A protein has these predicted regions:
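Single conserved hydrophobic/aromatic residue that forms the stacking wall/gate
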Residues: 146, 150-154
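Short, internal strand/loop/helix patches
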Residues: 85-114, 127
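N-proximal helix/coil linker or "cap" segments that precede and/or mark the start of modular domains
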Residues: 1-12
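Structural microenvironment flanking redox-active thiols in thiol-disulfide oxidoreductases
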Residues: 47-89, 105
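A short beta-strand-turn-helix
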Residues: 12-32
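Short active-site neighborhood of thiol/selenol oxidoreductases, capturing the structured segment around
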Residues: 27-43
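A short, hydrophobic beta-strand/beta-hairpin element that forms part of a small beta-sheet core
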Residues: 115-131
């Protein structure tokens, strides 16, 4: 697991929405950052789709959001950059959705599964890493209890 206190790890990945690279230096430096390691096909990610949209809508003025997919498109063609862009439009997301083809960034963050969340303070020090909460697909409503525990997200 990436140790708490770790500085935001630099990256420069293709934004599947704009077609341009999105460097981590483009992230606002004066507010917290939520890095979300997600993908299109995973039922655990699908479980959070509506809540990710709501969370971004409610907190995008206070927190920078960045989603990254690092899945192998040979094994998961539904996670291709083209499909990522389609899903982004279909769901009405408005945060960057980046593609980590070599899995370099996911490995640097020591991501083990999807979804995995990394919340950095306004100083860009890691204050939380892990799941949103303990809900599972087709079980409870999403509560974000784990993410909220550190009090960076109200």
């Amino acid at each position: 697991m990436l140790p708490l206190g770790t500085q935001l790890i630099n990256f420069d990945l293709p934004n599947t929405i704009t077609g341009q690279n999105y460097p981590s230096t483009q992230i606002a430096t004066d507010r917290p950052v939520l890095i979300m390691i997600i993908c299109n096909h995973c039922p655990y990610v699908v479980h959070y789709h509506d809540e990710l949209k709501r969370l971004h809508h409610n907190f995008s003025e206070q927190i920078s959001f960045v989603a990254i997919s690092s899945n192998d498109v040979n094994n998961y063609p539904e996670d291709s950059p083209e499909k990522m862009k389609e899903l982004w439009h279909e769901l009405g997301f408005s945060f960057p959705y980046l593609y980590d083809e070599t899995q370099t960034v996911a490995k640097a963050y020591q991501a083990e599964c999807t979804p995995e969340f990394y919340l950095f303070s306004d100083q860009h020090n890691l204050v939380y890493r892990g799941r949103c909460d303990s809900t599972l697909p087709k079980s409870n409503a999403v509560s974000y209890t784990h993410l909220r525990a550190h009090e960076t997200i109200p």
